[in-house]
UniProtKB/Swiss-Prot annotation:
The keyword Transferase does not apply. The lineage of its organism: Bacteria, Bacillati, Bacillota, Bacilli, Bacillales. FAD binds at D33, K41, Y45, V85, L120, D287, S328. Pfam families: Pyr_redox_2. This is Ferredoxin--NADP reductase 1. It comes from the Bacteria. GO terms for molecular function: ferredoxin-NADP+ reductase activity; flavin adenine dinucleotide binding; NADP binding.
Length: 348
């Protein structure tokens, strides 16, 4: 039975920084993530530019993920991907047991819950046979804007993301259509105004009711039905983007009643500014954590993560320092710093 000092559930910004900081505190660390790759929700908007991380110049979500993952791997944590933690309990030895969907049990002295808004599943288009087009031109997220260059694109949805993507694609795609089941878009006002002034065509009170394909491989026409008038319109398209929101899998703590973790608003971990939960040894970081003054930014997730790790360290060893030594004066980085200096000198 292999036991870890800390197991981090979730591989987004909060989980990744938790992994780095726990390594800095010389803790044996494991990350378990449901997704096939680390990075969390940032994967939903890889080409979006992120401005609000302190000390970083504006960069794409994709590059932010790359840097966060690289930092998280500094101290070689164990990483388990494509694995869902379904419940947590505690054994007679006082160790936390994380039960996963595959049947594995992971053992840990402490746990940091960093699952953000939960496991996100995009809401699928509710049309029979639609799933077969997901390998060709039915999309639930945008990973590359250039994929849509000079194409006819229809976006279904009226929220912030749908409106935002429509605005992004107007200058790239050949034509952009947006269809929404209501008569008023619910995105941010400035973005809605921008869209309405653009060349995009909007179809209100309409839904996609049929996908038409002669080759049975890719969608060639989309049938829209107006719920008010009953009118039906067939649009020739090259790409379909569905943005109907996400279903959240938030069952982890609900499935762990024996722990008694206090929950806020049916989902969030009711915690402290130090990232403590109501249960000693269990901590939370990122969007899953709730307390007065909580900052819902990536920058805030980093502070949550450091606080959670420090509390976990003290839980394991009450005599440990409250904080890690800062990296600029930490001997753990001496060899790494020398390599960086040598590399910089060689490149001159």
């Amino acid at each position: 039975m292999e036991v870890f000092d800390v197991t981090i559930v979730g591989g987004g910004p909060a989980g990744l920084y938790s992994a780095f900081y726990s390594g800095l505190r010389e803790m044996k660390t494991k990350i378990i993530d449901y997704q096939a790759e680390l990075g969390g929700k940032v994967h939903i908007y890889p080409e979006k530019v992120i401005w609000d991380i302190g000390g970083l110049t504006p960069m794409s979500g994709e590059n932010v993920i790359k840097q966060m993952v690289e930092q998280a791997m500094t101290f070689d944590p164990t990483v388990v991907l494509n694995e869902k933690v379904e419940s947590i309990d505690k054994n007679e030895m006082g160790l936390f047991q994380l039960h996963t969907a595959s049947g594995e049990i992971h053992y840990s002295k402490t746990i940091i819950v960093a699952v953000g808004g939960g496991i996100l599943h995009p809401k699928r288009l509710n049309l029979e046979g639609a799933e077969k087009y997901e390998v060709t031109n039915l999309n639930y997220k945008i990973t590359s804007l250039q994929r849509y260059k000079d194409k006819r694109v229809i976006i279904s949805g009226g929220g912030n993301s749908a409106v935002d993507w429509a605005n992004e694609l107007v200058d790239i795609a050949k034509s952009v259509y947006l269809t929404y089941r209501k008569d008023v878009l619910s995105g941010h006002e400035a973005q809605v105004t921008k869209l309405m002034k653009s060349s995009a065509e909007c179809y209100f009170n309409c839904s996609i009711t049929k996908l038409i394909s002669e080759n049975n491989q890719s969608i060639e026409h989309v049938e829209l039905t107006n719920h008010e008038s009953g009118d039906i319109l067939a649009l020739p398209i090259d790409e379909v983007i569905i943005n109907h929101g996400y279903d959240r899998d938030i069952d982890l703590l609900d499935n762990s009643p024996s722990l008694g973790v206090e929950i806020k608003d049916g989902y969030f971990v009711a915690g402290s500014p130090n990232s403590e939960s109501s249960v000693p040894g269990i901590y939370a970081a990122g969007d899953i954590l709730h307390h007065e003054g909580k900052l819902h930014l990536i920058a805030g997730a980093f502070q949550d993560a450091a606080n959670a790790v420090n509390q976990a360290k003290k839980y394991i060893d009450p005599m440990a320092n409250n904080f890690a030594m800062v990296s600029s004066h930490n001997e753990m980085f001496k060899e790494r710093n020398e390599k960086l200096k040598a590399s910089a000198a060689a490149s001159v």
